[in-house]
A protein has these predicted regions:
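Structural detector of well-ordered beta-strand residues that form the stable sheet scaffold
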Residues: 1-3, 166-167, 198, 231
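Structural motif corresponding to the early beta-alpha repeats
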Residues: 2-7, 38
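Short beta-alpha junction loops
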Residues: 5-9, 235-236
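Polysaccharide-binding and catalytic clefts of secreted carbohydrate-active enzymes
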Residues: 16-207, 211-214
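Non-catalytic, largely sequence-independent nucleic-acid-binding elements associated
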Residues: 217
């Protein structure tokens, strides 16, 4: 199984384009960790597409390659910079058919002078005290993951054979091991872009092993396609 190597950005990219790092509620990220980039950034997307296409050109025809894994445990990594804010406003305009009154009513924005009277005046949602608007923004952020995986799946599909699958290692909330539903990803929507569901399940070991995490993770991932699935990473 060949994985697309897009879950960590190289040093030269950050040096040349520092804004490829995600801007979150804590500000701009600092290079060092993996999975700290803005998955919507056009420069990141440009170079990611180049490396995906090159990888597919040299690997898709090989008989030993049975399938492809898109990225790695993809999430939105808290990205909430200017481009994401503008995308959210566009999303709301489409959702509410450009009707500000309906949107203000839906989210209760007349409270504490939160009312928005012009789309051009839409504030940075990172500072909102409105739980409904904040939840809608997180929903939008989760949709970025779905769009990102769909974008990669479309590229891979241009090269893969009919007998090769497309999967992704969907993960879970983390509390020292896999724990409950992943809050940053809608697994069911992302699975639409996969031909075979996949997951990472990390569990407690030895005296702490109960099987609960394994059973929960397996049940959830099986439901995505109502079929067998791949465990792409697990506790060693």
């Amino acid at each position: 199984i060949i994985g697309t190597p897009t879950y960590a950005v190289p040093t030269w990219m950050v040096e040349a384009y520092p804004d490829v790092l995600a801007e979150t509620v804590r500000g701009r990220g600092i290079y060092g960790t993996r999975q700290n980039m803005d998955i919507t950034h056009p420069v990141y997307r440009y170079h990611a597409e180049k490396v995906i296409r090159k990888l597919m050109e040299v690997s898709a025809h090989r008989k030993c390659v049975i399938g492809f894994q898109l990225d790695n445990e993809t999430k939105y990594y808290g990205t909430a910079g200017r481009n994401v804010q503008l995308g959210f406003v566009k999303y709301l305009r489409e959702k509410f058919h450009n009707d500000l009154d309906t949107m203000n009513h839906e989210f209760g924005l007349d409270y504490w002078s939160n009312r928005i009277n012009a789309w051009e005046d839409f504030p940075d949602v990172r500072g909102t005290i409105n739980g409904s608007l904040g939840a809608e923004f997180e929903k939008y952020q989760r949709s970025l993951v779905e769009e990102f995986l769909g974008w990669q799946a479309a590229i891979v599909s241009e090269y893969k054979r009919e007998d090769q699958f497309i999967t992704h290692n969907l993960d879970f909330e983390w509390r020292g091991y896999s724990y409950g539903v992943q809050p940053d990803v809608n697994h069911f929507k992302c699975a639409k872009h996969l031909t075979m569901a996949g997951t990472d399940i990390y569990h407690p070991t030895q005296d702490h092993l109960t099987g609960a995490e394994i059973a929960f993770g397996g049940d959830l991932i099986r439901c995505l396609k109502n079929d067998n699935y791949l465990v792409l990473e697990t506790e060693a």
